[in-house]
UniProtKB/Swiss-Prot annotation:
Composition bias type Basic and acidic residues, residue spans: 581-593
Coiled coil start-end: 517-594
Pfam families reported in the protein's UniProt record: Kinesin
Domain (Kinesin motor): residue spans on this chain: 177-501
CDD domains in alphabetical order: KISc_C_terminal (cd01366)
Family: Belongs to the TRAFAC class myosin-kinesin ATPase superfamily. Kinesin family. KIN-14 subfamily.
GO BP terms in the entry: microtubule-based movement; spindle assembly
Disordered: annotated span: 1-74, 581-617
A molecular-function term among this protein's GO annotations: microtubule binding
InterPro entries cross-referenced by the UniProt entry: Kinesin-like_fam, Kinesin_motor_CS, Kinesin_motor_dom, Kinesin_motor_dom_sf, P-loop_NTPase
Gene name tied to this protein: KIN14J
Transmembrane spans: none
Protein name: Kinesin-like protein KIN-14J
Keywords: ATP-binding, Coiled coil, Microtubule, Motor protein, Nucleotide-binding
Amino acid sequence: MEADPAPSSTPPPSSPAPAASPSRHPPGEEGGGAERVEVEEYVDPPSPDCCGGADPDHAPPPSPKGEEPVVSAEEEQAAVAGGEGEALRSFLEEFGDQGDDSLVPSPKLKQINTPDRLAALRFLGGKYNSLLERYKQQVAKCAEECAPRYDGLKKKYADECAERRRLYNELIELRGNIRVFCRCRPLSTAEISNGCSSIVQIDPSHETELQFVPSDKDRKAFKFDHVFGPSDNQETVFAESLPVVRSVMDGFNVCIFAYGQTGTGKTFTMEGIPEDRGVNYRALEELFRLSEERSSSVAYTFAVSILEVYNEKIRDLLDESSEQTGRKLDIKQTADGTQEVAGLIEAPIYTIDGVWEKLKVGAKNRSVGATSANELSSRSHSLVKVTVRSEHLVTGQKWRSHIWLVDLAGSERVNKTEVEGDRLKESQFINKSLSALGDVISALASKNAHIPYRNSKLTHLLQSSLGGDCKTLMFVQISPSSADSGETLCSLNFASRVRAIDHGPARKQADPAETFKLKQMTEKIRHEEKENAKLLESLQLTQLKYASRENVIKTLQEKIREAEQTSKTYQQRVRELENELANEKKAARDTARSTKPPLAPMRQRPPLGRIGNHIPPKAPLRLRLSKAPTIQNKENIPVMLNKGSSGADTSKAVAGKARRVSLTPVIRHIPLQPKRRSSLAVLPTQREQLSIFPDKRSVSRLSHIQMPRRSIATFNSIPATPLAAAAHKQVDGTPEARQLRRIEFSSSKFRSPPALARFNSRNNALSPQQKLRLASGSGNASKICFSVQKRVILGSPAPVKSSLLSGTGIFNPALREKMMAAKIGNAQRVFNTNRRKSVL
């Protein structure tokens, strides 16, 4: 078959030669020169077979995978030797640079007349294969260099996602929001056969967003904590729920419940199937795994309870007795504010197999029924409660927490499910309880003061989970079918309201006994804080008082220092004055010694009568009158004399027995004398002595009365004779005489009875005339001692005089002051009003 020259001269547009792969290397690379040398080796005249009878259209095109055409060495040598490649050589010489880089434009290539088209294709094929090989090498090299960086960035991205999820979970816990996970089931076979389409769009790169697209024009976005698509399995769903489940082991209350319309997969998510178990079983399995992991420090015990709310009645699903249908269970509120079902069975569990057995028993006893929407539709709300009690083995601290796993009955439309009879009644109760749940959610989202928890048994049981101290997770199950768009939209709106609830962060739940202890400790701490506040206030007041007293003390100290300084000044002044006074006294004494002549010796002194001109004048008398001592006043206490007692009859004085001898009076009349040495006594003159004693002109020097030594001779100046008594009344009746009347004979603090009675009773031999003889005469007057002190005069006893003095001269006050008071033995006692006026 001959070749057409026209087509051979101009290649067809579909020729692969112009469509060569562009170069992956820059024009200046060394590899291009090497390949140019190799190409020049191939440029030889083509063989006659190729030029003559070969059809260029049947030439093998270059392999896109880089397979080079098989050309033997003999053919290459023949082509070079034959010189059939002159046209190709001229082409390479003209377009060598462009050909090396495979950048020859196709229009330029079309205008070249090449007789050897096959050689050009071989050349381009080889060039393409070499470039492709170089490209693969570069890709492998880049992949080798970038693989570690890619792995690092991938790991960093995963860590950042985990950190963001952790921070988001912490934020939710701090805010107290209810976590909401949305799970969309796949379309069922019946829905696909009915021509239903999906109205839910989920972007795998945005795990928290969901697009609700009921039509091309309508589109609404919803945001949740996580969105699971139809392809997500049970393990993926539980992995996101794992942090909430683990918090039960730390002492927090947890509630996980599934909400949605009938047939959306709530029971499948919570319970699952034996081949692919749900959240309930996986959560309990995780709890047992954590208990074994922490067994060295914390001891855990588990108990499970399963109940259902059917037609607003609570049934215990673990009670298989025949009486359980008629048994009524009520909800009680405990002291710590949580809700408990009185009489509910709490079965202890020890292994995960025991958990599965209990769950199967509860699922068997649960109320289910067939509807047009679901053959095994749940006709009640199922609640699984797991109580976890833990005790720290080191500190002894105890906690009690629980986890609620709730599978709610599906909300449904009566006209759509086509139920009647008992199923219709069940649907009404289900919708009523779900409506009450919606009211509670709305009230919580609006933060109303009153939350209607008691409108339904379901909401009453979930009170602590929805609005209390609990971590809550909600699965909202939706259907992607366009036939259920209304129910899906309602479920999404309800889940959005639930996600907006903010009830504060959850707290650890302690054991009730521990709670009571904590309350007592809290009360004690509060009381101590009040006491501390009072003490602090008292301390502050004390500090203020102390500060004020410090100021007062400082002021007083200043005053004390000033007073001390003044005292020192005064003391200095006093010393100076004392020195001056001492000097003056010394000077006065010196002057007195020099001016006053010395006194003569006592034996050489002249008689008192001869120096009468030197007697100083008498000082004024200060008389102190007092009563005579009585028997009652034994202490000789001076008593002033009453005026009415001046006329009393002294002869009637009662004599008493004295315990002590009174020698000196208590009170003496001492006239004030100047401080001069004048020891001269005033004695009665000779005329006065003669007037008193007219019948006695000369007496002995000293008169004595011999008496026993233990006796005392004391007498009153008032004579016992009638004449003397009358004279006494005459003289003593005047005021002057009453003032001068003093008769006190006591020198002791013990008083003596009246001296007259004693003298009369013991010394009857002494007559009144002998008493008058006791007065000294003119002979012994110069030697009588007139002094306060006792003066003893030794001498012979005075002879008893028998002469009786007549007249009233003895009542003269001047003479009566000088009368002798008593005599004991050879000692005579006399009165003297002038102190230190004595002449021996």
